[in-house]
A protein has these predicted regions:
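ADP-ribose/adenylate-binding Rossmann-like module
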Residues: 76-92
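Domain-wide signal for the mature, well-folded portions of proteins, strongly enriched
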Residues: 59, 89, 109-110
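Conserved Rossmann-fold cofactor-binding substructure of NAD(P)-dependent oxidoreductases
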Residues: 29-57, 64-69
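Short, conserved SAM-binding segment of the class I
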Residues: 69-72, 76
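Hydrophobic/aromatic beta-strand patches that form the interior of the parallel beta-sheet core
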Residues: 19-21, 39, 59, 86, ...
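CheY-like receiver
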Residues: 50-51, 76, 115
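Residues that line or immediately flank small-molecule/substrate-binding pockets and catalytic motifs
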Residues: 62, 89, 133
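Oxidoreductase cofactor-interface core, primarily capturing Rossmann-like NAD(P)-dependent enzymes
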Residues: 1-33, 45-46, 67-68, 80, ...
Length: 150
């Protein structure tokens, strides 16, 4: 879901070249916008490195089952010369201890942020984007009569 939102926003800007990396075994029938390059990969370091060469930024939009896999992305990005990494930190900040208590899975997000801090000295900058809750998703699916938008 968040990946599609990011893709739509970035691909609408003609000054940005967008490349999407997707799982080899994905059966998704998603139609990608014109001009977007799509590579299917097994996400191994050896397959990621050549796909990341020449890229300025790597945005990870993986879900909860793949938070820890982002370490491979970080390492491959450094080896390929990527300048900035944006981890899948979307939603509530993993820096908040109360969040970790409520959502233990977010410890994996915090671990990635700590890993990125360690890797800064290797030339990779990073940005964590904590959007808080995705209220439009909550209001549409879980609480359709609680929150209204005009």
């Amino acid at each position: 879901m968040i990946g599609q939102i990011i893709l739509k926003a970035l691909s609408s800007n003609a000054k940005i070249t967008v490349t999407v990396l997707t799982r080899q075994e994905s059966s998704s029938t998603t139609e990608f916008p014109v001009g977007v390059t799509v590579h299917k990969t097994d996400f191994s370091p050896s397959s990621l490195r050549p796909l990341l060469r020449g890229q300025d930024v790597l945005i990870s939009a993986v879900g909860g089952t793949a938070f820890t896999e982002q370490k491979k992305f970080v390492d491959a990005a450094i080896e390929a010369g990527v300048k900035r990494f944006i981890p899948s930190e979307f939603s509530t900040s993993s820096e908040d201890d109360a969040v970790i208590q409520l959502l233990p899975l977010f410890q994996q997000k915090r671990d990635i942020i700590n890993y990125l801090k360690e890797k800064e000295e290797e030339g990779l900058s990073w940005t964590g984007i904590a959007t808080s809750g995705l209220f439009d998703w909550v209001s549409c699916l879980l609480l359709p009569r609680l929150i209204y938008y005009d």
